Amino acid sequence: MIVSGTKWEEDLKRAGKSKYKALARAIRDGISSGQMPAGQRLPAVRDLAHKTGMTPGTVARAYALLTDEGRLTAKVGRGTFVAKTNVMPRTEVEPLINHPNDENADFRSSRVPDVGQGVLIDQAFVRLGQSHRRRHINYPTQETDFEARAATAAWLDQDRLGGVTADDVVLGNGAQNCCLLALQSVLRGNHPVILTEELSYPGVRHAARLLRAQLVGLPIDDEGIIPEAFEQAYRAHGGQVLLTAAEVHSPTTIQTSLARKQALASIARKFNISIIEDDCHTTAPTDIPSYRAMLPEQAYFVSSLTKTVSGALRFGYVVAPTRQAKVLRQVAQSSFYGVAQPILDVCADLLTSGAAAETRNKVVAETRRRVRLAVNKLGAWDVRWREDAPFVFLQMPIGWRASSFAMACAKKNILIKPADEFALPNGAAPNAVRLGVNTCVNESLFLGAMDDMNALLGNPVVTMES
């Protein structure tokens, strides 16, 4: 199928802006017709891009689409192959969690750094076991999770949230789960629509797919979502909810300004659009109020202990709009009855004993240190960064495509995320990559990888020819 002089090449020439779809369709047809049998290896992304006159990013996007459909399978270090016919289509584009190992410098995920919190968590479990205060036999209830909800309310910045009590808080299994709960409580109708940033954390796509909702991407600038685009998108597509990472946007690190938040809240109020503010990447204090404070009857605030204390606990929370906590709690109970009681009790202990605050302060300091190290190494390039964001956003210099740079890094056992992986279905992405700064426990590995990336960025021609 992928040979010169065939009909699919003419289809690509007529494809316009949808070349990746045309390429995916051509490969799909080749598989269906038997021209591409199971196990056949596809050309390398750069080779096929050269043959077709497309960019490597376009080819990579077509491959990713077909991998998502289960028609192709990617094997690290070996290439992309036609999948076996008995392989069921995958429901996920990519895993949300990447497991690091000692051989790779893995910058794909935004993790909490190890600052000794494991010992504090162990001590909390010991205190729980020695207290014998619960038998840990029955299901968790609204009464038995009250201490954890009260501790969470006390943990939150009351000025930023507009005042929060335990009755406003609904607990879940991490921020991703809590976003799903909020979406389930808001979405309705036969064609639910979620409005969100045009670049979003991949979990947004997973949530929309799970809830069978349409995603509509909104353009952003240096101050956040553009208000006019928000209103235009609502008029064109409808939608019940805006899901936004306003304080620390992933992957760009953009912080939505106060004036911009006020403008967006005004539009949401005008059209009765709910807002879910995903605050999971925020670790340091901020002076900008949340949407929950600006629009208390329509806004949800979602976060967790994952980026400030530990991802192992899977402890997340939603601050519901006023008079909506009962509805949200019913959604949670219908989904999983409640967060496991031992986790509720241990997290309440961590929050009330000061262990969580101690850990958060160390995490903030370590994140700032790692960001400075990364910026010092890559400062010659176009890097967007903030000391309180656990990742940096690196624009590619002339001569590099993000997908090609990612492949070149992979050859050096450096794993990164191109901006394409944050694009919505059918959306565009800038020529950039995101680098999580807290992903390498070994600092020499971290610094060596930064040096390698710096060298690659400065020498794209030699790298592409090799």
Range-by-range predicted roles:
Residues 1-129, 134-138, 333-340, 362-366, ...:
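N-terminal basic, amphipathic alpha-helical segments
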Residues 301-364, 462:
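Conserved core segment of the aminotransferase class I/II
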Residues 196, 217, 275-277, 347, ...:
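Hydrophobic residues in well-ordered beta-strands that form the structural core
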